[in-house]
């Protein structure tokens, strides 16, 4: 270990504490890269010419997902994809990851993300999401990695006072999961203020759905899905009898809640745009961007779009509203369009088409075991 956070390359050149490579060809560490959004982003990084290292502990993912990424990417691109088994909660694991090679930037997906689980197990969420991220950042600073794209969430808007949600809106959190994201946004602002060389982009996702057009990678939740589209998908393939619709008395066009659904491929492209912004903007500081379509879709509109895409009727069961659910949440996308040059390309029909393609090819996700929940 040399002073200033650099490490010595095999040829003796000091690396890791300067600018490093910029843009395509740069080395990117992706935490949680075997997950739903992670796999789609890793694939796009490879297609854009980046060298990618994934660190994952497979808590909510499987090795097969990365095998599928390699299959889609092909041998030439996959030669630039490495994997290191590791857990962000372990400082030793983070040391191992950063001692292995130099990274020009980090995209940080790893973390727990189920709202209900976070309410039941808040300690687990703080240990994984907050403490794990602090371990990651400590390793980054030790080894001179100064750029990070952080996976935040629209949950930081809490119950929005108005829609669309604008990046400078009042922030709040309604559950431990959302609180961990809010805590980490503040953490990154503060550590960046203390180290002006750090470049941080916070990406606030809305509701990612869909899958890669190949149908070879997609969302594969363990147990009962927490999100709407995976649940609809499981009803469509016969794994669940019906879809519970929570509330049909909202003041919306059909009585069901409105959300901003975004295609996971658009979301992956948003990460590429954010990464390129970090490389191009030395004085960026710490900046937040929404990633959504800017359009709200009701629950019943999603059901109808999926029925049309799949040709399957989705039985529904009307249930009371869930406490804390918002009537309407969707993004303002002006800032991302203006500053990142990014906007969503796919509509709800595209999202449902690609989700169904994934479901048809993989009715039980990455597992061939039809006995799984």
From Swiss-Prot:
GO molecular function per UniProt: UDP-glucose 4-epimerase activity
Signal sequence extent: none
Pfam family, one: GDP_Man_Dehyd
GO cellular component, one term: cytosol
Needed co-factor(s): NAD(+)
Enzyme Commission code: 5.1.3.2
GO BP terms: galactose metabolic process; monosaccharide metabolic process
Active site location: 177 (proton acceptor)
Regions crossing the membrane: none
Catalytic reaction equation(s): UDP-alpha-D-glucose = UDP-alpha-D-galactose
Coiled coil stretches, renumbered: none
Pathway(s) annotated for this protein in UniProt: Carbohydrate metabolism; galactose metabolism
Residues annotated as binding NAD(+): 27-58
Residues the entry annotates as binding substrate: 153
InterPro entries in UniProt: NAD(P)-bd_dom, NAD(P)-bd_dom_sf, UDP_G4E
Family: Belongs to the NAD(P)-dependent epimerase/dehydratase family.
Biological function: Catalyzes the interconversion between UDP-glucose and UDP-galactose.
Protein name: UDP-glucose 4-epimerase 3
